[in-house]
Amino acid sequence: MSQSTTTTTTTTAAPAVPTGPREATLDAGNFCKRVKILYDSWNSDSNLWKSANSLVLALGQPNESNPYQKVTSLQTWLFGYELKDTIIVFLEKEIYIVSTSKKINLFQKLSETEQVKTELSSIKFNFLTIDKSDKNKSNFEKLIGEATKAGSNIGVIIKETYIGDLALQWEAALNECPLTKVDITPALSSCLLVKDLQEQKNIITSAKITSKVLKSHILPKIETIIDKGERQTHNQLADYAADIFESPEKISSKLTVEHVDYSYVPIIQSGGIYDLRASASSDDNPLHFGTIIVSCGARYKNYCSNIARTYIIDPTSDQKKNYAILLNVQSNVIKAIKPDVTFSSLYEKAIQTIKESSKPELVDHFPKNVGYGIGIEFQESLAVLNATNSRTLKAGMTLNIACGFQKISNPEGKDEKSKTYSLLISDTVLLNDEGKVEVLTDVGKKASDVVYMLGGEDDDDDNDNDPSVKLELPDDVKGITGRTIETKEKSKSVEERRRDHQKMLEQKNLQEAENKIKAMTDPNGKKGTPEVDYTAITKLQPIYSSVGAYPQDIVKNKMYIDPKKETVLFPIFGYMVPFHISTIKNISKSEEYIRVNFNTPTSYTQEQIDAGFVPPQLMYIREVTYKVNDPKVLANNIRLIKELKKKFTTRETEDREKRNLITQEKLILLRGKFPRLPEVHARPTLSGARRTIGILEAHENGIRFNPTSTKDRTPIDVLYKNIKHAIYQQADQESMAVIHFHLHDALMIGKKKTKDVQFYIEISEMSQSLDVSSRFNDEEEEERRERALKEKINNDFKTFIKRVEEIAPEPGLEFDVPYRELGFYGVPNVSTVFIQPSVHCLLSILEPPFFVLTLDDVEIACFERAIRSLKNFDLSFVFKDYNRPPIRISVIPRNYFETVKEWLDSFNIKFYQSERNYNWKRIMDTIKSDVKKFHDDGGWSFLDLEEEEEEEDSGDDDYHSNSDESESSDYISSMSSGSDDDDEDSSEGENWEDLEQKAERDDKMKTFDETNKRKRDEKSVSSSNRPSSSKSGSSSSGGGGGGGGSSRSKSSSSSSKGSSSSSSKSSSSKRK
């Protein structure tokens, strides 16, 4: 391609333009693609381009008061940079560029690339260097002469203000020439509407930055101001937010000042004076704790994004209704965004939604548009979403969807500034190349995210019964005040409100249960639960290849233990029969008898089945009893078998844990300075050490703990994506500051598999020596030092956590902080601990064993032993996954009863009350056997103590049993010792020790005083003759019996799919 260049001699290229990097290069690919878009539009739509024969982009010095000049936007779009002192003239087949020698050098390199030569071969490039000697007269004559040859109309940006010598000289020359100037501003804007993939990526990143600033900086700042009752003006808050954009390392360590800026100075509004226009600004009025509107937007590589949220403190019922309607309006507008839909139809959708709502009069308070296009320009003038814009949406467009109500009267406001308020919600969205809409800004906007209730303040307006606008406890309760957060309803007592909410939760659970049943059933109506085919399990290898491979020192008719093969050989009818140790369930003795119980398919756990420990044969020996005259031999055999079983079980447990481990991806280390906490303790400890001390570091995709106090220096890596719950408990009333991670997938730390990893620092000052005389105020001084130390450690932890949340990739990592005021004492494991709820879980993390219960996994909670005369009660949690065993927290002091009920209700957990303890294992087994029947029979309603009481009250004074009651108590019966079948089951396979203990308990029960308070024995096995309040059926599925005889055995024929124990008993036979 030929070039005509009238330029002065060029020295070595100085590659920097003022706003670009030092070694600036122009992207040939983007340039070619976007020049084609410009020429295609110019050639195809002469009306849009006003029949212009040539086009001009002229920039002298940028207008600092207008960061979104049209010419700079076009320069950025074409070349990636703002190019000062540059004039570009586009002709039909030529492009003329006038600029400084340094920039000309860049343009020449661009024009000489193979891509430009190939894709823009029809266009000739001409470069003219600025000539100050004649004030560019010759250059301008050349440009105007070529433009005149092309035609009489020259396209310019009419309203652009020219600044700088070059631009003013060009303006004068253009005014003196005979060419007719036509305005091509709309045509140039049309080129910017549809974004390519690179532009979309920039806007997505910009939206993430915007979301991070609001979520992690502006909102916490506002909450702190409200919490402490500080006085700060809107402008002070706006300046604080602007400083975050100007220091992008506070947002993410990957961001740089060159690429990040704010789209506009953030806007904070409150106190009755609101402006919903994009041109609004903050004022010097103090922040009012009523309705607060926050707007902010980031600019990443010159591409803009925007977000706005309204936060409401102590709203009236009207405010809640209006906000719910506004949410619905924005949701419907976003759903209506599709290719080839007109901009005006989106506005019409918003108006329609308001008119169809319960408050159609809000139309009068709705703005004249629902947003606009956004990209390099913050507001794309051709893409305003109003009632008159007939342009259509195209894939690749990005929009700022802004919906609001302005100047709404609020006569019930708590003060004069609350009498008028406005609402605004705004999000940046993308209509992607697949024609689907994506919301790019990610900050909560549900009522539970934006509504705050200051405790202790009456809300006379909370008598609204509309479930669509029901005020919920915010999901991310930040503790705006140190007081208990509460909502009061004037027309209802607390108990009535709670009861109504519980009924609503019950209906919600029923709906979820229906969905669960549908998911478990295939289209043919068959259950989706797979059956286990025992005949297909062949993982156990043959122990001995033949009888000749038996050990040489074996003695006929004597039991033999072979540790090498992990096998016990039993004499049966004169033959030595080998049994792998995994087939032996337990072994016991009584006087001169030794009794062995075997595992059979009905007594194997699912893990054992999955591990392949179920033999494929269909005939199984369930028990065998031998008479051994020598007590020493008997004791030695039992000892050897138990030791072998323990060794095997330990090894298999470790192997199974290792098999189940998920392989983690590698930790990506950050270079340079990264967040770290020194002298931190870790739990679990490494290699059995008493303490493990080291350095906690935050990196790109996870946390690393580098131990410094142990011989084992293997680091502990926790990836962000593997963290289910991140918990921070500060050293307030506790003696340690703790960062605790509850994981999705377990880690192997040392030889221990764990889902809970903890890092902490103990607050331990040097104790005062008792043999040294103390000063009068030593104790006070020590308390002061401890408080100062706690404050320092808390600040260090908070700084580290804040940096971790900034580094963690989207959707980000947020730390839960427990609510101490909602805590209570209980026994979740083996000892009494203080248990606290947080936003997402119930936890006790100060001492191992740790307890972390995910509240989202809970279906119901059940209060057990909820009797006023008792000093404590129990609380059980049943999970949505019925395969998970329920968890019980025992011995909770009675004075916490109302507190626990209140927070369970606030966290939307349905609870029941009962005067007894349930055998949850039996209940869950019954439910899992037929989930559909369980829910058809009323589901969890059998746990409802209040309903039971109502039924009892409605009947006669005397108790009358009936068939209906027996049917309704199908599941309640599970708390007793079990059905007759279960009793028969438990009479087989019990060892002698169990039988003796059972007999002793039966004797004691005869003298049991019915007037005494019921005592709970956690280790007791339920009796078959009385209801039990503790776990029943602790003995194995084999049970009872056993007699004398030198060699007796019971066997059962079990189907390949696992017959019930009753069928096993009926088909007893001897193994041949």
UniProtKB/Swiss-Prot annotation:
Protein keywords: Chromosome, Coiled coil, DNA damage, DNA repair, DNA replication, Nucleus, Transcription, Transcription regulation
Region (Disordered): 1-21, 946-1072
Compartments, record wording: Nucleus; Chromosome
One BP annotation, GO: regulation of chromatin organization
Acidic residues bias locations: 946-956, 979-994
Composition bias type Basic and acidic residues, residue spans: 995-1020
Top-level division of the source organism's lineage: Eukaryota
Disulfide linkage: none
GO cellular component, one term: FACT complex
Coiled coil segments of this chain: 486-522
Biased composition (Gly residues): 1036-1046
GO molecular function, one term: nucleosome binding
Feature: compositional bias, Low complexity: 1-12, 969-978, 1021-1035, 1047-1072
Keyword Transcription found: yes
Record function comment: Component of the FACT complex, a general chromatin factor that acts to reorganize nucleosomes. The FACT complex is involved in multiple processes that require DNA as a template such as mRNA elongation, DNA replication and DNA repair. During transcription elongation the FACT complex acts as a histone chaperone that both destabilizes and restores nucleosomal structure.
Annotated family: Belongs to the peptidase M24 family. SPT16 subfamily.
Subunit structure as annotated in this protein's UniProt entry: Forms a stable heterodimer with ssrp1. The spt16-ssrp1 dimer associates with a HMG box DNA-binding domain protein, probably nhp6, to form the FACT complex.
Protein name per the record: FACT complex subunit SPT16
Organism expressing this protein natively: Dictyostelium discoideum (Social amoeba)
